[in-house]
Amino acid sequence: MEQLRVLEFYSGIGGMHYGLQESGVDFQVIQSFDINTNANLNYKYTFNEDSSQKSIESYSVEELEGFKANAWLMSPPCQPFTRLGLQKDDQDNRTNSFFHLLDVLTKIKDPPTYILIENVFGFAKKGSSNTRDHLLDTLIKMNYSFQEFHLSPQQFGLANQRLRYFCIAKRNGKLNFKKEQDKHNEKVDENKLNNNSNNNNEQNKYDNLKILDHIPGYDFHTTLEECDEISNYFDKDLTDDELYEKYKVPHNLLLSKGMLFDIKQKDSKTSNCVTKSYGKFIEGTGSIIQMDNNFKADINDNKSLIPLKLRYFSPKEITRLHGFPEEFKFSPKLTTIQCYRLIGNSLNVKIVSELLKVLVSPNEEEEQQEQQKEKEGKK
């Protein structure tokens, strides 16, 4: 297989880059792009490569074509689709860069063979995602076979629930799943799609397309018992007491709003999604850890939370839950809160790596063509 020449859009702290590494494919990241200064600082610290801070919208068709990339990986801004956000979809200016990339895709002379996209669950919300509609319109127009997924790290053995939308697309060729192959990769017949107006907020033309909750042929972890306890993700260079002192939840916060926290014990086998507001806001931003299991809280008494020794996950511990390799480090120039913000905007490396394996795997026809080339080369 040819080397992947990758453009990594919205690169953040390099989740897609690490996904490429873990997948085992031969690749080169030609250029990464992000407007976040701290993300680019850490990307440079990690990979010793500079990300472009130039806005994606300012790149012309000719400039993007000049990279000669055959793979585009991207995790566009999720705020227009988040559960706690305004959900303005394509009316949110933060979608402009993504729409620009889709426009470039229709004009570029040599479009990328492979595309992988990650976003929040709400990106494909039924009846109200014009952005998703435009994505699928573009993929169909440009002759891509594609498959959408809703996947969570827990399915891959990680003690974390973070349901996300993924889409993989391959141009001029079918995707190759290990099993159930005949059930997927179907060409989308636009005449069979529901063409109801988006304005009725009831059904979009793509609502009937199946979004898979698994990767066909992948041996998923189906129960919590198959996941490690969250204590296995703890930083090992500090004792439990030291971790508590370094990341403890302030007592005044526990006394005022303590019962809003999602509390997990050290032997729990799951944790809730960490957002970029972790460590700053409380409800819906991620789990905290009970370091002393000898006490139980009284839901009517916030003072009962104090003996539990409640602390936040460290930034490094969260990256382990996100499937980042142990070699990953944060720049010492970043504060803990800045690290939390970067992690909350990141993605799960393990899931990306498994989807990349499917994306680049040759289908039966491509394997036969490759074998024929090898035979001709031996003559």
Swiss-Prot record:
One of its GO terms (biological process) is tRNA processing. Its EC number is 2.1.1.37. Disruption phenotype: Mutants exhibit altered gene expression, and after undergoing 16 development cycles some mutant cells displayed reduced growth on axenic medium. DIRS-1 expression was unaffected but Skipper expression was increased in mutant cells after 16 cycles of development. Mutants lacking dmaA exhibit culmination defects including fragmented, transluscent sori, and fewer spores than wild type. Keywords: Chromatin regulator, DNA-binding, Methyltransferase, Nucleus, S-adenosyl-L-methionine, Transcription, Transcription regulation, Transferase. One of its GO terms (molecular function) is DNA (cytosine-5-)-methyltransferase activity. Residues 178-205 are annotated as: Disordered. SUPFAM superfamilies: S-adenosyl-L-methionine-dependent methyltransferases. Pfam families: DNA_methylase (PF00145). Residues 193-203 have a biased composition (Low complexity). The active site is at residue 78. Residues 4-366 form the SAM-dependent MTase C5-type domain. Belongs to the class I-like SAM-binding methyltransferase superfamily. C5-methyltransferase family. Involved in epigenetic gene silencing. Methylates specific cytosine residues in the retrotransposons DIRS-1 and Skipper. This is DNA (cytosine-5)-methyltransferase. It comes from Dictyostelium discoideum.
